[in-house]
Regions:
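Terminal RNA-binding accessory module
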Residues: 1-73, 150, 232-233, 399, ...
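Rossmann-like S-adenosyl-L-methionine
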Residues: 2-4, 8, 13-17, 217, ...
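Short, acidic/hydrophobic/Gly-rich beta-strand patch recurrent on exposed beta strands
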Residues: 20-25, 146-149, 219-221, 386
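Flexible, glycine-/basic-rich loop-and-beta segments that form/coincide
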Residues: 63-72, 154-155, 492-500
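Local cysteine-cluster metal-coordination motifs and their immediate loop/turn environment
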Residues: 67-86
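Small-residue-enriched alpha-helical segments and adjacent helix-cap loops
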Residues: 80, 94, 98-105, 354
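Composition-driven low-complexity segments enriched in polar/acidic and proline residues
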Residues: 108-139, 151, 207-208
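Internal alpha/beta scaffold segment
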Residues: 154-203, 224-226, 231-270
Length: 500
């Protein structure tokens, strides 16, 4: 197999993350965005040590597993790779991927309890947050608002019938795109921000909706590069006699009124205007102004209430998050109560560290079955939100510290009895992992959103005297290639292993 060669073959399986293994006469090639059983053409773009990687050119024959996509944007939108497969088949693929990765490192420890995969309680309309991009679907095409086209950094598909959000999102998306398209038709040149030339006004539309309360927060993200026909404020507009000029305030007021007039199932509690002049194509704020209502909303999980702002981290599938956190709580609570011989209502004398704690969701769920929970999170805004949420929920045994886990662990006087880990996708820094292991706690709970990072860290845990007792995959993201994994580790007795 040579670089540049076009091959055709059958996808034998899909490994995490989204790597289709294509078998052909010349050997095998790894290709993204392919499904098991598909016949595909791909171009080989890398050959190294006998292993080939390629780019998908065409699906020449559908997989016998495919049943058709309920989403009209499938194939053009880069979002939902698995949406043409039945949900049960998606779960089977994800379960096999996680089990294969775990087995690859746990074969040395012997048996462990793998509990399969837990399905999301809802498959359609499950997302509570979407970041839509402004752009065009082709060069100099009409204004688009939606998701990036598959394989493209620049082209944007208007996903007006997206299936992973509910109808309120779709109405808001259509409303905003039609509003700015109408302004363009009136000669007001509100262009999208061009990512190469770094010019333009419209950047992103952020929509968040609570699954339980139905509260909706909307944020329009723009640059400060106003179109020529638009002035910043009324005072600036008075300096010219051109009556066709608009102010930015007028444009934003018109958008606000258009949004508030929508017939929605949920309730808009806040509309924000965020300015962002950063070069990077990320949703961030240089300045945020409230156009309507407030800059936060409330969501409820497992009997707790959470105040969520524009940029607060929160699991994007609220009902799926309840399954994830119930699993984590059951793993830890079962250990605490059995080891103490305590009744379910009794609070044991245990200190829990929740590392990479985000907005403190897990910490607050663990608080009722622990003496104290200490959360550590590097994002200061998330820590502030965690502190406010503990007050909101009347929890007095939680402490949250803002800082890098690697550095903060050296400053905490308390010693943990149990450690909960929920790190970013790339896993735990090796030096932080060493400090965590040196506490020598009996049990560690590891929640991972990227199983390849998880198994890399598990190898270190196993080498340092821990074993995996229980593991389960949890599907938070139907139709996509992503999957969460929950693992409970316990410390082996000294005579069970030899450290070298």
């Amino acid at each position: 197999m040579k670089k540049g060669q076009v091959i055709e073959g059958i996808v034998q399986r899909v490994d995490f993350p989204n790597k289709g293994i294509v078998a052909c006469e010349e050997g095998t090639c790894v290709v993204k965005n392919a499904l098991p059983g598909q016949k595909v053409k791909c171009a080989v773009n890398k050959v190294r040590k006998g292993k080939a990687e390629g780019r998908l050119l065409e699906v020449t024959e559908a997989s016998p597993l495919e049943t058709g996509s309920p989403c009209p944007h499938f194939g053009s939108c880069g979002g939902c790779t698995y949406i043409s497969l039945p949900y049960e088949e998606q779960l089977r693929i994800k379960e096999e991927q996680v089990k294969k990765l775990l087995d690859s490192v746990l074969c040395s420890q012997g048996d462990y309890q793998f509990e399969g995969i837990k399905a999301s309680p809802v498959c359609f309309g499950y997302r509570n947050k979407m970041e839509f991009s402004f752009g065009d679907e082709w060069k100099d095409g009409p204004l688009s608002l939606g998701m990036h086209k598959r394989g493209s950094f620049y082209d944007v598909v208007s996903v007006t019938d997206c299936q992973i959000v509910d109808e309120d999102y779709r109405k808001i998306l259509r409303c905003v795109r039609e509003y700015f398209t109408a302004l363009q038709e009136r000669g007001i040149d509100v262009k999208f921000y061009h990512r190469l030339r770094h010019i333009g006004y419209l950047r992103h539309l952020l929509v968040r909706k609570a699954a339980k309360t139905g509260e909706i927060l909307i944020a329009l993200v723009t640059t400060t590069q106003l179109p020529e026909q638009v002035k910043k404020d009324a005072e600036e507009s008075l300096l010219t006699e051109d009556k066709d000029l608009f102010t930015e305030v007028q444009i934003l007021e018109g958008l606000k009124q258009a949004l508030l007039s929508l017939p929605l199932d949920g309730r808009i509690v806040g509309i924000l205007h965020t300015r962002n002049d950063a070069v990077a194509d990320v949703v961030k704020s240089d300045e945020t102004n409230i156009l309507y209502g407030q800059d936060y909303f409330y969501e409820e999980l497992l009997g707790l209430k959470f105040k969520i702002s524009q940029f607060s981290f929160f699991q994007t599938n609220s009902r799926g998050a309840e399954v994830l956190y119930q699993t984590a709580r059951e793993y830890i609570s079962g250990y605490i109560q059995s080891s103490d011989g305590a009744d379910a209502g009794k609070i044991p004398d245990k200190v829990v560290f929740d590392l990479y704690s985000g907005t403190g969701t897990i910490a607050q769920l663990m608080a009722p079955v622990a003496k104290k929970v200490i959360g550590v999170e590097i994002v200061e805004e998330a820590v502030e939100a965690a502190r406010k949420n503990t007050e909101l929920n009347g929890l007095h045994n939680c402490e949250f510290i803002a800082g890098d886990v690697l550095k903060v662990l050296d400053t905490i006087e308390e010693k943990p009895d149990i450690i909960i880990l929920d790190p970013p996708r790339d896993g735990i820094h090796p030096k932080a992992l060493d400090k965590i292991i040196r506490y020598g706690v009996d049990h560690i709970l590891y929640i991972s959103c990227k199983p390849t990072s998880l198994v890399r860290d598990l190898e270190v845990f196993l080498d340092r005297g821990y074993r995996v007792d229980r593991a389960v995959a949890v599907d938070q993201f139907p139709w996509t290639a992503n999957v969460e994994t929950v693992v409970l580790l316990s410390q082996r007795k000294a005579d069970d292993y030899v450290e070298v």
